[in-house]
Design a protein with these regions (language model features):
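Residues at the starts of beta-strands that form the adenosine-phosphate
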Residues: 3, 26-27, 103-104
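N-terminal Rossmann-fold NAD(P) dinucleotide-binding loop
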Residues: 13-14
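Conserved N-terminal Rossmann-fold NAD(P)-binding element of oxidoreductases
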Residues: 4-9
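NAD(P)H-binding glycine-rich loop region in Rossmannoid oxidoreductase-like domains
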Residues: 29, 35-91
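Aromatic pocket-lining residues of Rossmann-like dinucleotide-binding sites
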Residues: 20
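Conserved Rossmann-fold NAD(P)-dependent oxidoreductase catalytic core, especially the SDR/UDP-sugar
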Residues: 91-132, 137, 141
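Glycine-rich phosphate/pyrophosphate-binding loop and the adjoining helix
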Residues: 143-169
């Protein structure tokens, strides 16, 4: 199957990692906190220390990845940090992905972050992916039901892998 990268592999990311592994995928998850790496590895995923606010720290994590899941819909930080994360940092990350093996993107477009920032991030993902003909899904599955979110996110990965994503969800 495919190698999936989960950028922002916190609580929901680990649930998704477990589901993707159960579906036969290899999974790599990123965390900014080295103490959280054990939680990622406990679900069977490869842990990588990397910060989406410092895109260069994610370069190694992109190696041999087919689908990237950008799960930053409930990221924390100051309003300025979150605005940069879902705009300039996201744009830099997408630009770096173009020249890699990534051929599908899932962007979490719903969460606790200001909906206007997530909408802008979703528009950026749509524009970059459509320009590059990379399948993408804007994940808008509510976060209150963990099981429903996990199933929706895993199905989004399948859609991106199948190439029939075109921004659905």
């Amino acid at each position: 199957m495919a190698r999936c990268l989960i950028i922002g592999c916190g609580c929901r990311g680990r649930l998704l990692a477990g589901e993707l592994i159960a579906r036969g995928h290899a999974v790599r998850g990123t965390t900014r906190d080295s103490a959280a790496a054990g939680g990622i590895e406990a679900v069977g995923a490869e842990a990588v220390i990397g910060d989406p606010d410092v895109v260069a720290t994610l370069a190694r994590a992109l190696d041999h990845v087919t689908v990237a899941c950008i799960l930053l819909g409930s990221a924390t930080g100051t309003p300025a940090q979150l605005a940069a994360l879902h705009s300039t940092r996201l744009e830099m990350l997408l630009t770096r992905m173009i020249d890699t093996t990534v051929r599908g993107i899932v962007y979490e477009a719903e969460g606790t972050v200001d909906p206007a920032l997530l909408d802008a991030g979703g528009a950026l993902v749509r524009a970059r992916c459509e320009d590059s003909r990379i399948p993408y899904v804007l994940l808008r599955t509510g976060t209150s039901d963990a099981a429903a979110w996990t199933a929706g996110a895993a199905d989004a990965v399948t859609s991106a892998l199948d190439g029939d994503a075109a921004g659905r969800r």
